[in-house]
Amino acid sequence: MKSEIFKHRFIVPASAIDDLNHVNSVIYLHWCLEAAEAHWISKTSEKQREQYVWVVLNHFISYKNPSFLGEELETQTWIDNYQGAKSERHYKIIRSSDKKIIVEATTLWCFLNAKTFHPTKITEEISNLFMQI
């Protein structure tokens, strides 16, 4: 069971370019995290976001192709599975012009109570917002 794919398109800004004249590898991770946050915000209420937060347990990222200033990219993200307080989120960053995969990544997230910062089981209410049956 996985979630629908959340998509976000953007243009590579000058601030993302490194000394090798392509996107700095750390920036891709930042874009993945931005997409995860946007997906969370798009599905949840303000009240839910005040009750719960997510923290990263680990990241895995694989760089497939470089990208450059001014290119249009699309970040795709989806939740592949979850159990207890943990959720595995996947990402692809794809160049719009030729559909080449630039980055593939996975993040293991932990669901927390926003007041105590203790891990808490992902509620049915939250999982139903994201997961396809």
Write out the residue ranges for each language-model feature.
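Hot-dog-fold acyl-thioester-processing enzymes
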Residues: 1-58, 112-133
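HotDog/MaoC-like acyl-thioester-processing domains
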Residues: 2-4, 68-69, 79-133
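Residue-level recognition of well-ordered beta-strand positions that form the cores
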Residues: 9-11, 60-62, 76-78, 92, ...
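Hydrophobic beta-strand-centered segment that forms part of the acyl-chain substrate-binding groove
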Residues: 39-87, 103
